[in-house]
Amino acid sequence: MCIRDRAKPVAVLGHSQGVLAVHMTRAIEAAGSIEAAGKTLDEILAVAALIGAAGTRRVRELGLNPKYGEASPMLSVKGATREQVEALVKRVNNARGPISIAVTNSDNHHVLSGYPEDLAALALEAEREHKHQAKLREQKLHGGTVFNPTLEYLEVTLPFHSPLMAEAVEQTVSWAGACGFDQDRTRALAEEVLLNHVDWNARVKALFNAADPAKLWIVDLGPGNTLGKLIGNVVQGTGIGVVEATTLSERSTLSTLESE
């Protein structure tokens, strides 16, 4: 995702694994061209493969089944504050492992990582809380909006951005060293993808201070239109424009407009 003030990009943001593209963009900028950055780009792509392999290996070591009924290792919770999500996490008894807030997409949209069975237990707690508040509302003992978040399991096989993946980071760095790759860059990439919490909400809002929001345009490069929707929710009402460039057709149209 490229953020532009007129013709000059002021920032490049990547959501979750999109950080790989951010590092590739920086490498191209530092080298002066795609051709000059070729070796670094190849290494980043190779590290991406190592990250995936290390994550898969760690999941097997943990005995983490990527499916538990409908549950997966990551659960989107939309329509709940961080405090409400943390309260639900505390209600899960006898969890197999940590349930962590992996991604903060907005003030009321969070994604959790953990064992699928633990996330399924949290989903049950959310349903119990909804029914409890609905009953209180029906009895006129509770005012305001009834707690009713939208829950959706992500189609993933790893609990990304989770402390469960700490050993996978070390494994990735070890393999990268054996391959002769830059271990510092490898660690940074692996931690961003596997371990660190992603505060997308804060990253996007930081742009508001980078330039006049009314002059900023965000170009969504995909893949798909999910990211455009996520960022649209954060920048709504700020004056920042969002342009979709997720397909060849959309990019071709933008190139034509720019040349005109």
Where are these regions (language model features)?
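Alpha/beta catalytic cores of group-transfer enzymes, especially the acyltransferase/condensing modules
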Residues: 25-188, 192-193
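Gly/Ala-rich beta-loop-alpha elbow adjacent to hydrolase catalytic centers
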Residues: 10-18, 22
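Short helix immediately C-terminal to the catalytic nucleophile in hydrolase catalytic domains
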Residues: 21-22, 26, 228
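Glycine-rich beta-strand-to-loop/alpha-helix junction loops that act as flexible
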Residues: 15-17, 115, 221-223
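A generic hydrophobic-helix recognition signal that picks specific residues
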Residues: 8-11, 154
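Acyltransferase/transacylase module recognition
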Residues: 4-9, 159, 163-260
